[in-house]
Amino acid sequence: MKEISMEKVEAARQAMLETVKSKSLTHEQKVATMANHADSLLSVLDLPEGLLEVLRCEPEKQCICDLFEGNAPMRPRYIIPDYEKFFREGSAFLQVEPPKDLYEAINALQIFYKHVPSVTNYPVYVGQLDTLLNPFVQDMDEELAFKMIKLFCIQMDRTILDSFAHANIGPRATKAGRLLLRAMAETKDAVPNLTLKYDEELTEDDFAIEAIRCAMASAKPSFCNHRMYSKDFSGNYVIASCYNGLAYGGGAYTLVRLILSNIAKRAKDRKDFLEKELPYIMDLCVRYMDERIRFIVEESGFFENNFLAKEGFIHRDRFSAMFGLVGLAEAVNILLEKEGKDDCRFGHSKEATELGVEIMDCISAFNEAHKNPYCEVSNGHFLLHAQVGISTDVEISPGTRIPIGEEPENLADQMEVLSHFHHYFPSGTGDLFPIDRTIHQNPEYVLDIMKGAFQKNLRYLSFYSNDSDVIRITGYLVKKSEMDKLKQGKSVLQDTVALGLGAAENGKILERKVR
C-alpha cells in the first residue's frame, strides 16, 4: 500500500466531520458516505502514468471518470445473481429453503436482497420477477396475490434506498407480470426500476399496452429490444441498474467512462482527435480498468470468500467490464466548430451524424483490439456502454444522446439519428421521451413508436408522462416531490434523489421535449 500525504488525511477527516454534522443525510446515508471517506485514504492500485492528470483534475479538463468506485475496489461494481438457482436450491449461508408458496418466495427475496452488494451497497438487479413469482400465483386468490405483490413493491421502495435497483419482466405475458404492472401503476414509487423485454413476435399487444399505461402512471417500465440483447448475450442477459445489459449469473467488475467533449477540447482538429488525443485517453482508460479488475480478482478475495460465488449464484467468468462514454454530441459539435462549421449540429446534420459514427467506429475498433484475461464472457473485450451521466455533468450529454433543448422537432428525425448509434452498446444505451398527458387515452401511439424504433435497431426506450411525479432522470427514477424536499434542506429516504436534483439543476432534465 502506497503512502498518502497528511494533506489528504486532513481533507478526509474534515469531510468525515462534515458528514457527521450533516442535517440532510439520513443515518444510512451517513454510514455509506463515511465508508467512502475511509476508502479515499487507501492507495493500492498501480495507476498508469499520466492518468491522474485527466482523472483527478478540474471538471472542464477531466477526460476519464471512474464514477466514484473508490480507491480499493472490494467487490465488482454490478452483481447479477442467479435468482432461479436460489429458488431451486435455497442458500446454506442464508439458511433459506427453496420457497413453496408466494409468502415464502417474497420472504426469501427480501432476505437475499440484503446480502447482494454493489457500488451502491444495494442490489442493482432484483430478478426477473414475473417468471420468479408466476408459479406461486397460479392457484391463489388473485386479489390476495395482488396485495402481497403490491406490499412487496412498497417494501422494496422503502428498504432498497437507491433507485438503481432494477427488475425485469417479459417478453411473454404472465399472470405475475400483469400483477406487478398493476401494483407499480398504483404505488408510483421510484424503486424498483423496471424493464419489459419486448419482442414483437413474443409480447402480446395487450400486455405491452398494459405496460405503457403503467409507464404513463409511474415512469416504468422501460422497454428493451429483446431480440437485439438476446443476440448480444446468447439469450442469457438481464437489464440492471440504469439500463445496463449484463450476463446472467455474472455482472461487471467496473464502469469507467470517457468524457468525449473534454477530449475534443484537447484536439487541434478532427485528425488530431481521432489519431492522437482519443487513442491516448482510451489507452489510459483501459489500462486503469485492467488494474481495477486485477485487484478485484487477484487481491480483494471477493470471489473466494463471498457466499454468492461459493454457492454458485455468480460465476467469476461471467463478469466483464463496461467501457463507458458521455458527451458524443458535444464532441462532434466542438470538432465541427474547429472546422468553421458552426451550423452543423449533432442531431440536425448528416455530417454531424457521420462524424459521430466515425468516432464510435474508432472507439469500437480500439475496444476490439484490447484484451483482458478476466473478461471471458465477452471474449476478452470490454462492453461498450453509453453512460447516463452524473449529477455534476454540465453541458455533457449522456452517451450518444442529442442534447436536451436541441431535439429535432419531428420524432422520426430524432429516431433516425439514434438508430446510427444504439447498436454499438451491448451493455446499455437508451433514450427518454416525456409524453403529453393526452397520450394516456392512446397508448397504441407509444406502442407504434416502439415497434418502429426496434425495427430500426434501437436498443432501449423509456417513456413517461410529462405531468407525472415519478420521472426518469437519465436511467434511474426519482420523484419530483422528493427533489423539492431535498432542495428545501429536508432529509429524503433514497440517495438517488440528490443525484436527480443535481441533474435537474445542471443537466436540464426537466426541459426535455415533450412528445
Where are these regions (language model features)?
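Conserved catalytic cores of very large enzyme subunits
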Residues: 2-317, 338, 344-349, 365-515
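Conserved phosphate/anionic-ligand binding catalytic regions in large, soluble enzymes, centered on
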Residues: 124, 315-331
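Non-catalytic, well-ordered alpha-helical scaffold segments
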Residues: 127, 279, 325-326, 357
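Terminal accessory/anchoring regions of large secretory-pathway or extracellular enzymes
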Residues: 329, 349-353
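Well-ordered alpha-helical scaffold segments within catalytic/enzyme domains
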Residues: 330-338
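Short amphipathic alpha-helical coiled-coil/interface segments
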Residues: 355-367
